[in-house]
Every structure is written in structure tokens, then in C-alpha cells.
Design a protein with these regions (language model features):
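Short alpha-helical DNA-recognition segment
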Residues: 12-31
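A short, Lys/Arg-rich alpha-helix, primarily the initiator
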Residues: 1-9
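Alpha-helical residues within the helix-turn-helix
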Residues: 8, 19, 51
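DNA major-groove recognition helix of helix-turn-helix/homeodomain DNA-binding modules
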Residues: 43-59
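Short, charged recognition helix plus adjacent turn
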Residues: 58-76
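Residue-level detection of the helix-turn-helix DNA-binding "recognition helix"
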Residues: 8, 22, 33-35, 65
Length: 76
């Protein structure tokens, strides 16, 4: 699944998602359009998005290796 798919499932506009998460709407658009790789996002940004969308990291990250590394880091 992608960030955009999760956001749409929650019936949120980009602006609403940005406001809920505190992530700049332009940055959110860049992640959704692939201009910026969400797998390289700061952990704090990922967590803000997950909290706003009520989802897990695995639902918005597209790279399995990145997800595994983050899960290991968070468990420490």
C-alpha cells in the first residue's frame, strides 16, 4: 500500500492529512508523487503521518528493508 492509498482510504484530503500530522502539505505531495522517497523520510515525519492516518509504518513504507531496519530500531 502507499501513503496516498492509505490517506484516500481514510477519506482525507492532502490538506487535512497535512494539518492532522503537522507535515507540510507540499512535502506530503512530494512523497505521494514520488518526488521524495518516503523510505528516506525522518522517523519523526513517518510517525506523525502514521498517527494522523491511524496506521502502521508498514502501510506507508514501500521498501521492506527500510521497514525492517526501523522496526529493529524502534524495539531497542
Amino acid at each position: 500500500m502507499s501513503l496516498q492509498e492509505v490517506r484516500r482510504q481514510r477519506n482525507l484530503s492532502q490538506r487535512e492529512c497535512a494539518e492532522r500530522s503537522g507535515v507540510n502539505v507540499r512535502i506530503l505531495q512530494f512523497y505521494e508523487q514520488g518526488i521524495r522517497d518516503i523510505n528516506g523520510a525522518k522517523l519523526v515525519t513517518l510517525l506523525k503521518l502514521c498517527n494522523a492516518l491511524d496506521c502502521g509504518l508498514g502501510e506507508i513504507l514501500t521498501d521492506e528493508e527500510t521497514l525492517k531496519e526501523l522496526e529493529i530500531y524502534i524495539r531497542k
